[in-house]
């Protein structure tokens, strides 16, 4: 992928800014998400809560199922591949998916290397829990970053921790003298020009969404107020009592994230939220996969 293509991919990801991306497992769910105002959907066979409950090895979804969702909606469709599994990424590119998420939700295929995303034309989304991870993924060709959070839990604490960590490290880097940036680039294991960009612009070179544990309109607004440019919602919608109403409320919450009165109205009468798992009760932390 040449520089021009990468810039185009970054612009494609920019178009999702201020939006909500929802996990869906069927064409029917995809239609509900589109009608609710989702800017994109993530097609997968099992949502993170089910992956966590079932355990075992989780892999890329069946391409036939992904195609069914692509045919059902007009908004962009994303799909997940395993960390380091470049052949799964090749398959997803062949079915003409709009975005690929190299995701820690699935079982990693490579515990050393991530995919060289510069070899693909399709834009990639990657998770990060700190600035070093974010910049390393961008250096590999990611066009969009999201917090890792802790998928399938309905517990927002990890997403908050990761977003605050990235913001704190950006502020620290922005305040450095230029002669300190070379050492910082070495420590973060990324090229100097990426570190310089963050120093000068006080932000990542790509969009940064929040993901992992978003279950309510309040959760979505919290992540936006902390600096997220959009939100991924996985298990929180279709594991709740009234998915359609909750989906609409979360989309509106992202748009009106600074208005507590609107957020109060949106939070009323949504039915039961997903049950959720407390961070302290989890044996397997997916966020620790892929550094």
Swiss-Prot record:
Its EC number is 4.3.3.6. D-ribose 5-phosphate binds at residues 23, 152, 213, 234-235. Pfam families: SOR_SNZ. SUPFAM superfamilies: Ribulose-phoshate binding barrel (SSF51366). One of its GO terms (biological process) is pyridoxal phosphate biosynthetic process. Signal peptide: none annotated. The keyword Lyase applies. Pathway: Cofactor biosynthesis; pyridoxal 5'-phosphate biosynthesis. It is an enzyme of class 4 (lyase). D-glyceraldehyde 3-phosphate binds at residue 164. It catalyses: aldehydo-D-ribose 5-phosphate + D-glyceraldehyde 3-phosphate + L-glutamine = pyridoxal 5'-phosphate + L-glutamate + phosphate + 3 H2O + H(+). GO terms for molecular function: pyridoxal 5'-phosphate synthase (glutamine hydrolysing) activity. The active site is at residue 80. Belongs to the PdxS/SNZ family. PANTHER family: PYRIDOXAL 5'-PHOSPHATE SYNTHASE SUBUNIT SNZ1-RELATED (PTHR31829:SF0). NCBIfam families: PRK04180.1, pyridoxal 5'-phosphate synthase lyase subunit PdxS. In the presence of PdxT, forms a dodecamer of heterodimers. Catalyzes the formation of pyridoxal 5'-phosphate from ribose 5-phosphate (RBP), glyceraldehyde 3-phosphate (G3P) and ammonia. The ammonia is provided by the PdxT subunit. Can also use ribulose 5-phosphate and dihydroxyacetone phosphate as substrates, resulting from enzyme-catalyzed isomerization of RBP and G3P, respectively. This is Pyridoxal 5'-phosphate synthase subunit PdxS. The gene is pdxS.
